[in-house]
UniProtKB/Swiss-Prot annotation:
It comes from Albidiferax ferrireducens (strain ATCC BAA-621 / DSM 15236 / T118) (Rhodoferax ferrireducens). It is found in: Cytoplasm. This is SsrA-binding protein. The gene is smpB. Disulfide bonds: none annotated. Required for rescue of stalled ribosomes mediated by trans-translation. Binds to transfer-messenger RNA (tmRNA), required for stable association of tmRNA with ribosomes. tmRNA and SmpB together mimic tRNA shape, replacing the anticodon stem-loop with SmpB. tmRNA is encoded by the ssrA gene; the 2 termini fold to resemble tRNA(Ala) and it encodes a 'tag peptide', a short internal open reading frame. During trans-translation Ala-aminoacylated tmRNA acts like a tRNA, entering the A-site of stalled ribosomes, displacing the stalled mRNA.
């Protein structure tokens, strides 16, 4: 029997990303974190919707990933909740991403944070921004699916 994906290991999802972007490819990257950040992530005190990925000197960094510190976690240091976090990926993957991001219209967006083998990973996507009419189409599709589900639900009663 196939192993089901563990949804409990998800820490945070970027729900706005699917609305604002078309995803070309998805990648998984490790994060360089401090101890207080890991403790806060265990409690789910993170906001990922404003995050984006930049490339500096051949390295990837996540900006705008807001991790709110616990009140008891960091008493001897002053935590910076908007700290820029480095992403860890293989050099070949980074080179491939740099080549694609340099093409017009492509960007890197964090999709979610999750646990994998005791480590916190960030799923990022090579994405292209949606135009306003594409966003409207997404809303129409979502409402259409909702109507169908509602109709099916009333027919089953």
């Amino acid at each position: 029997m196939a192993k089901k994906p563990d949804t409990a290991s998800r820490i945070a999802d970027n729900k706005k990303a699917a609305y604002n972007y078309f995803f070309e490819e998805r990648f998984e990257a490790g994060l360089v974190l401090e101890g207080w950040e890991v403790k806060s992530l265990r409690e789910g005190k993170v906001q990922i919707t404003d995050g984006y990925v930049v490339i500096r000197n051949g390295e990837l960094f996540v900006i705008g990933l807001q991790i709110n510190p616990l009140g008891t976690a960091s008493t001897h240091i002053s935590p910076d909740k908007q700290r820029t976090k480095k992403l860890l990926m293989h050099k070949e993957e980074i080179k491939r991403l740099i080549g694609k991001v340099e093409q017009k219209g492509y960007t890197l967006v964090p999709l979610n944070l999750h646990w994998k083998a005791g480590k916190i990973k960030c799923e990022i996507a090579l994405a292209k921004g949606k135009a306003e009419h594409d966003k409207r189409d997404t809303i129409k599709d979502r409402e259409g699916k909702r109507e169908v589900e509602r109709a099916m639900k009333t027919n089953h009663r």
